[in-house]
Structure formats: structure tokens, C-alpha cells
Amino acid sequence: EERDVLHISLSPFYFLSKGGHFVARSSRLESGFQDRLIESLKALFPGCMVFKMDQIQGLPDLLILYGEKWASLECKRSATAKKRPNQDYYVEKMNDMSFSRFVCPENKEEVLNELQQAFQP
């Protein structure tokens, strides 16, 4: 019997394999949060465009275009999730240009409130 999903437990990391690709559990958690965040952004900012950025090291995960304004968000699975090299640099630099934040489930509402203020005309 062929299986589509293979679960392997390597505490504290969990992996899911589907179609021969392994994805760390932490990445899946971040991805699920990111998908829900995109839904929230589209509901809060009708007509906005949300782009998942290339995986260039350090660039924020999402670019949001709304009217004449833009923002970037770096998604983290939790407030204590490790940052990768250059992430602080790019979030700070893009925040100086417009609006950029690290966002996680613990600060999502706060960041969305700040983004609403930033996107006001």
C-alpha cells in the first residue's frame, strides 16, 4: 500500500513528507499562520495585493500593496522563534521606508492595528 504521508518524529523536530519533500513542522506552523494572516489582510484592506516574497535570505515574507502605500511583514511561528541572518536589517530598513514588522500569533492584532493606522490616507 502506497502512503501519501509519512510522519517521522525526531524530538523536538517533526517532519512531514508528501511527494518526497520534507518540511519541518515549525515551517508548516509558520506557513499556516501566514495563510491565515493573508486572509486577515485581504479582509481588512479590500483590494490590497499580497505577495509572498522570494526566499532571499532576510527579506520579509510578505509584501502588501494598498492604494499608494505598501508594507512588508516577516511571519514567525511564535514570539520566541529564531530570526535568520539579515532579517532585523531588512525589517528595520523597510520600516524606515514605509512599514515593516515581525508578526506572530502573539502580536498579530497589534501589528494589524498599526498597519491600519499606517494605511490611513
Q: What does each model-found stretch correspond to?
A:
Residues 3-121:
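Catalytic phosphate/metal-binding cores of nucleic-acid and nucleotide-processing enzymes, i.e., regions
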